[in-house]
From Swiss-Prot:
Its EC number is 4.6.1.18. Pfam families: RnaseA (PF00074). It catalyses: an [RNA] containing cytidine + H2O = an [RNA]-3'-cytidine-3'-phosphate + a 5'-hydroxy-ribonucleotide-3'-[RNA]; an [RNA] containing uridine + H2O = an [RNA]-3'-uridine-3'-phosphate + a 5'-hydroxy-ribonucleotide-3'-[RNA]. It is found in: Secreted. SMART domains: RNAse_Pc (SM00092). GO terms for biological process: defense response to Gram-positive bacterium. Substrate binds at K35, R38, K69, P70, V71, N72, T73, K94, R113. The gene is RNASE1. PROSITE patterns: RNASE_PANCREATIC. This is Ribonuclease pancreatic.
Amino acid sequence: MALEKSLVLLPLLVLALLVLGWIQPSLGKESRAMKFQRQHMDPGSSSSSSSTYCNQMMRRRNMTNGWCKPVNTFVHEPLVDVQAICFQENVTCKNGQTNCYKSNSTMHITDCRLTGSSKYPNCAYRTSQKERRIIVACEGSPYVPVHFDASVEDST
């Protein structure tokens, strides 16, 4: 009797484990919109004048795990203002896609560039504060930024 119950429950247990195995990885996967926020948004701070800002932020935001990300830009504006860019001037992305948008106004940003002598795991970055219009790629529903494409001088 107990053996019969075990034989019935075993396939159900195996099925449950298989389903969890397929579902679980997608539960922990970071969406493109969340990755954009992690890698590029720092609205709580003004563009820091500290020369160590990029070194600290690149580590804190997990962009130096396994390699040194060569270039990254942090945006020091409210998230809603950056999300609004998705409904501003449509421009062609660097890769030729047509889902990029340029901000109507300049934004406070910090550019982080890997120094020439820097090697993993000792990633060292040069910090540059700028006021630039930014270009982001947008997708999804809701339509939100998923990629930082460029920053450009204000031409007005």
